[in-house]
């Protein structure tokens, strides 16, 4: 492989893995299987090792996790919640053992093996035995404050058996029986069901209303002690015993092993026992038990050297493929999906499986009526692995992708260097509908109450066809729709009205310009400050911006060189939709003498003008430090709407409190 090709492939893999990380760790909405993610990661690691000149500090191969959403308050972990390196077979486990023994110069080593619970990783903070704060893992450094929701989980003690100050870490999960019951209720109510227990747990814990989490019958296993004051515990196994004595729920199926052979035997044992548990596990975690040896081995930027996660092979089952259904995405890509005779895979009933594209169907010679092997290695629609040719009867039908769009009957095209067929009709109803769903999504205009179901209702009723149509909706129209009452209709109209005040970057991202993600949208918004200035920009001006490449620049210029788009922007203006950047430029804050220099600040509640992540960046650019909890060392609390318990903590510690208006005044000095 030439250096040029290697560089291009490395960049492609980084973009791909960053997208997968964001979908999995931030949105709780993964789009690929664990196996596919791992394949791409291993390819990237190999290419970077072979081409060290292309190594980058921000490569997915060396960093932890993704970005945190501006929904809950931010919490900075006192020590990073690192991810673990992976082992996929016995050889990987033996390599891990060899590295450990080399790193400790022949000292005796004992391992502790634990079941890897498939849930949501959280940290729990206790002061003098009282539960004061819980947070998600987030990107490993900064998580989200989910204290109130965690308090609804009965397995989490609100008061410990000793008045000790500590941070424990664990995995919140939904038992299988609770998952089945929840999905049955959602089906009866006509709601979308959860794909699996992990998604159900994550979705429940990240609800803004703790009452919803309380109804979901979640549980939790604590798997580690991050720190504890005035106490030294020499081994991980003893720390788990200590946590159990304090009142935490720890998993009883852990085992200490003196040799790697014992570790391998434990892995094989639980691979067999796995289906009989009432909770999902996706592997085994193996750790060096001795804490002193852990400290000696240390960590890499991404994971500890003293621990590894063995990942179970994807579960594979056989079922019959009864048909192939096509869907059209917002960019026009036509994706085939296999329709299957229902079969249980990895704890859920599966009726559909991804076929990705026409090339895959041809490569695997998939035909309607075939018996196929299906696997589900992660949290997504499963994939067809292969056909069982021995079961063919001769009655199976070969499948050919259509030449015309299934939604609008326009001719399909295959763009250069793409394997997917694409509908390029800008009036295709399927693309319009998917585009509307994207426009109102969390990272775009973030219109609460406008999800896929409601957008589909509005679209089918012919109430909306363009983004601007959303701002012409009336309460009377909503009341004509199923499951809308006076209150819900009023709330949705208000949510749509509120979205008019969003900063420019949200609108830009919502437009769905090809190649422009949320990060690029913010870059454009901060650089040009208004939509009008961006519309006038040339390709050369766009390419001159840091991190904006030729492909993206061309896409932006092409998008705005369209009369329909310009008409849409004019309609936005008429409806009063903001098209200016409301943020404060980071670059303008550098080297400025500021009140915030050397100050410790806590942000709480909803900030209307900027998200808390942006406020944090501004404070840090001015020399301040942002923390997630109020203490006697805190200098200032900035309180937005619906500020919670941190106000009481500020009063207790006699800390000054500002509202958002006062905060912005100080920033703008």
UniProtKB/Swiss-Prot annotation:
SMART domains: BRCT, HhH1, LIGANc. It is an enzyme of class 6 (ligase). Zn(2+) binds at residues 405, 408, 423, 428. Keywords: DNA damage, DNA repair, DNA replication, Ligase, Magnesium, Manganese, Metal-binding, NAD, Zinc. It catalyses: NAD(+) + (deoxyribonucleotide)n-3'-hydroxyl + 5'-phospho-(deoxyribonucleotide)m = (deoxyribonucleotide)n+m + AMP + beta-nicotinamide D-nucleotide. The active site is at 116 (n6-amp-lysine intermediate). Its cofactor is Mg(2+); Mn(2+). One of its GO terms (molecular function) is DNA binding. Residues 591-669 form the BRCT domain. It comes from the Bacteria. GO terms for biological process: DNA repair; DNA replication. Its EC number is 6.5.1.2. One of its GO terms (cellular component) is cytosol. It holds the Pfam family DNA_ligase_aden. NAD(+) binds at residues 34-38, 83-84, 114, 137, 171, 287, 311. Belongs to the NAD-dependent DNA ligase family. LigA subfamily. DNA ligase that catalyzes the formation of phosphodiester linkages between 5'-phosphoryl and 3'-hydroxyl groups in double-stranded DNA using NAD as a coenzyme and as the energy source for the reaction. It is essential for DNA replication and repair of damaged DNA. This is DNA ligase. It comes from Bacillus cereus (strain B4264). The lineage of its organism: Bacteria, Bacillati, Bacillota, Bacilli, Bacillales. The gene is ligA.
């Amino acid at each position: 492989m030439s250096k040029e090709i290697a560089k291009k492939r490395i960049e492609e893999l980084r973009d791909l893995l960053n997208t997968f990380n964001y979908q999995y760790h931030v949105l709780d909405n993964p789009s690929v299987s664990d196996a596919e993610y791992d394949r791409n990661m291993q390819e990237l690691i190999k290419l970077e090792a072979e081409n060290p000149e292309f190594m980058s500090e921000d490569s997915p191969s060396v960093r932890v996790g993704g970005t945190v959403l501006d929904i809950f308050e931010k919490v900075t972990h006192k020590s990073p919640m690192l991810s673990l390196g992976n082992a996929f077979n016995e050889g990987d486990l033996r390599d891990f053992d060899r590295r450990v023994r080399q790193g400790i110069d022949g000292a005796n080593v004992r391992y502790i093996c634990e079941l890897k619970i498939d849930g949501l990783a959280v940290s729990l903070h206790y002061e003098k035995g009282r539960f004061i704060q819980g947070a998600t893992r987030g990107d490993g450094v900064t998580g989200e404050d989910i204290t109130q929701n965690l308090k609804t989980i009965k397995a989490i003690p609100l008061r410990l058996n000793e008045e000790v100050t500590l941070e424990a870490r664990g995995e919140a999960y939904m038992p299988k029986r609770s998952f089945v019951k929840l999905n049955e209720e959602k089906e009866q109510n006509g709601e979308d069901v959860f794909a699996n227990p992990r998604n159900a747990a994550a979705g429940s814990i990240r609800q803004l209303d703790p009452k919803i989490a309380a109804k979901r019958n979640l549980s939790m296993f604590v798997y580690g002690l991050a720190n504890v004051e005035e106490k030294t515990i020499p081994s991980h196994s003893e720390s788990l015993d200590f946590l159990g004595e304090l009142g935490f729920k720890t998993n009883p199926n852990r085992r200490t092993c003196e040799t790697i052979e014992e570790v391998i035997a434990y892995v094989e044992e639980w691979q067999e026992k796995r289906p009989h548990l009432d909770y999902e596990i996706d592997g085994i975690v193996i750790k060096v038990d001795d804490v002193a040896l852990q400290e000696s081995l240390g960590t890499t930027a991404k994971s500890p050297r003293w621990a590894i996660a063995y990942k179970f092979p994807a579960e594979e089952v056989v079922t019959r493929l009864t048909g192939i259904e096509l869907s059209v995405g917002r960019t026009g890509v036509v994706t085939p999906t296999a329709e299957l005779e229902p079969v249980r895979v990895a704890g859920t009933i599966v009726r559909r499986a991804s076929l990705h594209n026409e090339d895959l169907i041809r490569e695997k010679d998939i035909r309607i009526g075939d018996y196929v092997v299906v696997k589900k290695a992660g949290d997504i629609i499963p994939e067809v692995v292969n056909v069982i040719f021995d079961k063919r009867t001769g009655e199976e039908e070969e499948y050919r992708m259509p030449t015309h769009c299934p939604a609008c009957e326009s001719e399909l095209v295959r763009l250069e260097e793409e394997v997917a067929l694409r509908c390029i009709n800008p009036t295709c109803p399927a693309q319009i509908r998917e585009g509307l769903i994207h426009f109102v999504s969390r990272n775009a205009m973030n219109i609460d109450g406008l999800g896929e179901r409601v957008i589909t209702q509005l679209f089918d009723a012919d109430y909306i066809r363009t983004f601007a149509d959303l701002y012409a909706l009336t309460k009377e129209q909503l009341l004509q729709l199923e499951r809308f009452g006076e209150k819900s209709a009023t709330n949705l109209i208000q949510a749509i009205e509120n979205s008019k005040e969003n900063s420019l970057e949200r609108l830009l991202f919502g437009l769905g310009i090809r190649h422009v993600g949320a990060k690029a949208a913010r870059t454009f918004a901060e650089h040009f400050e208004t939509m009008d200035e961006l519309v006038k920009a040339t390709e050369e001006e766009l390419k001159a911006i840091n991190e904006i490449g030729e492909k993206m620049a061309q896409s932006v210029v092409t998008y705005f060189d369209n009369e329909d788009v310009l008409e849409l922007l004019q309609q936005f203006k008429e409806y009063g939709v903001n098209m200016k950047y409301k943020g404060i430029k980071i670059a303008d804050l550098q080297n400025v003498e500021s009140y915030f220099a050397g100050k410790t600040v806590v942000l709480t509640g909803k900030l209307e003008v900027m998200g808390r992540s942006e406020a944090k960046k501004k404070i840090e650019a001015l020399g301040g430090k942002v923390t997630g909890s109020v203490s006697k060392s805190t200098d200032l609390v900035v309180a937005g709407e619906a500020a919670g318990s941190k106000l009481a903590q500020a009063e207790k510690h006699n800390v000054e409190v500002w509202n958002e208006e006062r905060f912005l005044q100080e920033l703008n000095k």
